[in-house]
UniProtKB/Swiss-Prot annotation:
Stored SUPFAM superfamilies: Release factor (SSF75620)
PANTHER family from the UniProt entry: LD18447P
Post-translational modification: Methylated by PrmC. Methylation increases the termination efficiency of RF1.
Molecular function terms, GO-annotated: translation release factor activity, codon specific
Species of origin: Burkholderia vietnamiensis (strain G4 / LMG 22486) (Burkholderia cepacia (strain R1808))
InterPro entries, sorted: PCRF, Pep_chain_release_fac_I, Pep_chain_release_fac_I_sf, Prokaryotic/Mito_RF, RF-1
Protein name: Peptide chain release factor 1
One Pfam family recorded for the sequence: RF-1
Length: 360
């Protein structure tokens, strides 16, 4: 184990002992906010220090076995004990490295998932609908809650644009690598010659902003227009101006919501999506310089980057960032995404570990 990593773990062990002392005091609950902070920190440090204690025990076991090597009658036993201790140390060190990785502050947040049809006309809109179904089925498997925020249906089915809110533990940490261009290759239902068409959609995954004060929006910077909601094909679906369009003048970001019959609810939803888009824009601007110096294959979230191809005739899905091809497209489109998402998370962790190694 690197000296820098061991030093960090020693510091965390000392801090955990301090927390144990603080939490055992009689007046610890006098300040509930402080008490919650201490218990949260204790919960985060406990598993790390526990793993480190196991690593140190394995190191001590190896040292004890080394002393037995001089005794010929104990040599076989000692060599086996050394091998076993080193295997445990290697495994525990790998787990500790992952535990010490810097945490994305957005990982525990709910998300807004936005899917837009791109090149390919009606077929692209149909594929946007298929992608939405894929994510909704995955959310169902995770027992997450889903709320439709805004939808713009296309004439033949599917969506020109759709935004849903997904709420649940780990929503952003599991889906944040879905941002980017998704390409589909298949024979459209409207194709009479059996030719394979290529079309594309873009996906954006945005962490939900906190209710209070995280994104400051000056009401003077907003232009709010109301209009009659319309369905596919442009037909009006109610006779009141319940649909709301919010424009954030400084950034040019526009959000429309028309799914509810209540203008107030549509406005509230539009402002929530707007806050998430502004937060997302700020996040990407903040990380632009960092991305330029160290190109991250997984975590860039660049909407213009083609990240994945879905080839229906061959029944395969290829993620171009990690060169992963899975020949079980039907299951993937039905929301069975654990293998794919797990591979992306693992690759991202490997990138972070490599960058930490470069820094040492």
């Amino acid at each position: 184990m690197k000296t820098s990593m061991q030093r960090k773990l020693d510091q965390l062990s000392v801090r955990l002992a301090e927390l144990n002392d603080l939490l055992s005091r009689e007046n610890v609950t006098a300040d509930l906010d402080q008490y919650r902070k201490l218990t949260r920190e204790h919960a985060e440090l406990g598993p790390v220090v526990e793993q480190y204690a196991l690593w140190r025990q394995s190191r001590n076991d190896e040292a004890a076995a080394q002393e037995l090597l001089a005794d010929a009658s104990m040599r076989d036993f000692a060599e086996e004990a050394i091998r076993s201790a080193r295997e445990r140390m290697t495994r525990l060190e790998g787990e500790l490295q992952k535990m010490l990785l810097p945490k994305d502050p957005n990982d525990d947040r709910n998300i807004f998932l936005e899917i837009r049809a791109g090149t390919g006309g009606d077929e692209s809109a149909l594929f946007a609908g298929d992608l939405l179904r894929m994510y909704l089925r995955y959310a169902e498997r995770q027992r997450w809650q889903v709320e439709m925020m805004s939808e713009s249906p296309s004439d033949l089915g599917g969506y020109k644009e759709v935004i849903v809110r997904i709420a649940g533990q780990g929503a952003y940490s599991r889906l944040k690598f879905e941002s980017g261009g998704h390409r589909v290759q298949r024979v459209p239902a409207t194709e009479t010659q059996g030719r394979i068409h290529t079309s594309a959609c873009t996906v954006a995954v945005m962490p939900e902003a906190d209710e209070i004060g995280e994104v400051e929006i000056n009401p003077a910077d907003l232009r709010i227009d109301t209009f009659r909601a319309s369905g596919a094909g442009g037909q009006h679906i109610n006779k009141t101006d319940s649909a709301v369009r919010v424009t954030h003048i400084p950034t040019g970001i526009v959000v429309e919501c028309q799914d509810d019959r209540s203008q107030h609810k549509n406005k509230d939803r539009a402002l929530k999506v707007l806050a998430a888009r502004i937060k997302d824009k700020q996040y990407h601007e903040q990380h632009a310089k960092e991305a330029a110096t160290r190109k991250s294959l997984i975590g860039s979230g660049d909407r213009s980057e083609r990240i994945r191809t879905y080839n229906f005739p061959q029944g395969r899905m290829t993620d171009h960032r990690i060169n992963l091809t899975l020949y079980r497209l039907e299951a993937l489109m039905d929301g069975d995404l654990d293998e794919l998402i797990g591979a992306l998370v693992s690759e991202h962790q490997a990138e972070l570990l490599a960058s930490l190694g470069d820094a040492d």
